[in-house]
């Protein structure tokens, strides 16, 4: 019997969630600075993450920044919740993006791109040309942000498919989760 498209997508959600967890762990390990194609790209965990726990229907837990969400994130991950969505910021040179990455579907939501530069006051007032210029600049900004995440996902897939995943990467990820969970004050850990 042929599987439906939706059942195939649902069966593969784990990979995006593993990627998101690996990415957040890598940000912690490397201080958020990652070398990509000769540039230093800075990534940071934003002010909101959504975790999901299996079940029918699945239970969701949203952590919103009240200072530092990492300890509560660690406790939740240690208890088997899966990182489903995270707000991230990407900085490359002088440009900064903010977006929400959905790990289950590997989609981007609510991307905020860098501000467009000021217009040259001496330039002729050609609204159509200005609009087209702004549109092309905005499309290039989106392409750059997606390119960073594509590069990171490809790096994750190479590691995930290698022997290094079980030998080094997964144990390092588990150690990071344990360390985060130990940072939580006892009262917060009981509520996660």
Where are these regions (language model features)?
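Intrinsically disordered, low-complexity, charge-rich terminal extensions
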Residues: 1-192
């Amino acid at each position: 019997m042929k599987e439906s498209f939706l059942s195939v997508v649902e069966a593969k959600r784990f990979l995006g969630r593993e990627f998101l967890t690996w990415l957040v762990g890598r940000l912690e390990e490397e201080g958020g600075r990652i070398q990509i194609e000769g540039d230093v790209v800075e990534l940071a965990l934003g002010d909101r993450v959504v975790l999901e726990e299996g079940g029918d229907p699945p239970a969701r837990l949203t952590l919103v920044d009240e200072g530092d969400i990492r300890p509560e994130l660690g406790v939740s991950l240690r208890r088997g919740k899966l990182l489903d969505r995270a707000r991230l910021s990407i900085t490359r040179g002088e440009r900064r993006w903010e977006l929400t990455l959905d790990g289950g579907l590997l989609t981007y939501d609510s991307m905020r791109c860098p501000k467009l530069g000021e217009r040259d006051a001496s330039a002729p007032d050609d609204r159509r040309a200005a609009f087209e210029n702004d549109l092309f600049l905005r499309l290039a900004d989106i392409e750059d942000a997606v390119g960073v995440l594509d590069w990171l996902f490809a790096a994750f897939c190479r590691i995930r498919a290698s022997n290094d995943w079980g030998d080094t990467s997964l144990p390092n990820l588990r150690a990071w989760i344990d360390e985060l969970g130990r940072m939580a004050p006892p009262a917060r850990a009981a509520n996660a």
